[in-house]
Amino acid sequence: MEPKIYVVKRIDGEYAYIADESGEELFIAMALLPSGVDVGARLVYENFEFSLE
């Protein structure tokens, strides 16, 4: 599976709203993201895991 890049658009409590390169937005629990994630952070999704770019 090829890595996918997401950008954190906003954080609402325990959820982050992230968008991929095409602009498609989804929300995900903060517990699944690396610590220190903030609005504007770029994330890489690879092997069923998020990491900071």
Residue locations for each model-derived region?
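Glycine-centered tight beta-turn/hairpin loop motif at sheet-sheet or coil-to-beta transitions
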Residues: 1, 21-23
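Structural detector for short beta-strands of small beta-barrel domains
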Residues: 1-12
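Short aromatic-glycine-enriched beta-strand elements
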Residues: 14-17
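Beta-strand/loop nucleic-acid-binding surfaces
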Residues: 24-35
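Short, Lys/Arg- and Gly-enriched loop/turn segments at beta-strand edges
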Residues: 48-53
